[in-house]
Amino acid sequence: MINESYRIVITGYSGFLGKNLMERFNNSEFLLIGRDHKEIERIEDFNPDFIFHFGAEIYNQEDMLDSNIIFTYKILESIKDIDFKAFIYCGSSSEYGLKSLPMKEIDLLEPRNMYEATKGSCTLICQAYAKMYNKPIGIVRPFSVYGRYEKEHRFIPTLFRKFEERSEITISPGYHDFVHIDDFIDGVLCFCFSTTDKIKGEIINLGYGKQYSNYEVYEIFCEVFGYNIGLNRIDSLMRDFDNNNWISDIKKAKDLYNYSPKYDLKMGIKQIYDERNNR
């Protein structure tokens, strides 16, 4: 927990990442910004210490230009003339596109769809504002974050539900670099409490640095629960955004920002398992 009191602006406050971030700042005052562009006008008078831009349109392609790019631009315009400790934009590992090696922050962005393109565009806009106005504006790129408050339709919560019900699960191919929500938030905090020069225009990957296949994740669940459930493998089904390589290079985050993820995937699944069984 961050016991000091800060004034914090946050978008995406009702989402998985935003909720967990807010819980760390337990004594702070928040200005919560939704999707109404008019709410951005409140930021300057609020005089924030930190701005966390975690909100984004993921599903509706028609809304992505306005909700992602224009919204980000307007927030940056609203803060360019005020002093603050850090503005952190939550990008996405999907900005990289398909790579054959662990993904580095300096890699070329090769988006494959509108969401990835808008996230990559916002990253570049944030970097431009950081340089134009000499501001501590930085970007975090989360990989496959999992943990409390994650939406129930996602892979890890689905596995928990299926194992608790002891019902069959269908799994297709895919690889992910899973990072526990507590490790992700720790990384965000290491970054945002850095000096201006270490934030300004910088990007850091926040993953664990190891990838697992979906089938390996299933096996970990079998170990944690102590029993198997029926598995329907569909090896021929590979989605557009799936890849045989999806792993973060986290050397920069470790070396420059003391990022040190604590939970390997089995430890993280066991931690959530214990939480769910002690409710």
Residue locations for each model-derived region?
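N-terminal Rossmann NAD(P)H-binding glycine-rich loop of SDR-like oxidoreductase domains
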Residues: 2, 6-26
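NAD(P)H-binding glycine-rich loop region in Rossmannoid oxidoreductase-like domains
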Residues: 39-70
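Conserved catalytic-core motifs of eukaryotic protein kinase domains, centered on the activation segment
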Residues: 60-65, 98-102, 151-152
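Conserved Rossmann-fold NAD(P)-dependent oxidoreductase catalytic core, especially the SDR/UDP-sugar
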Residues: 74-114
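Active-site helix of classical SDR
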Residues: 114, 118-122
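NAD(P)-dependent short-chain dehydrogenase/reductase
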Residues: 124-190, 218-225
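C-terminal substrate-binding subdomain of Rossmann-fold SDR/epimerase-dehydratase oxidoreductases
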Residues: 167-279
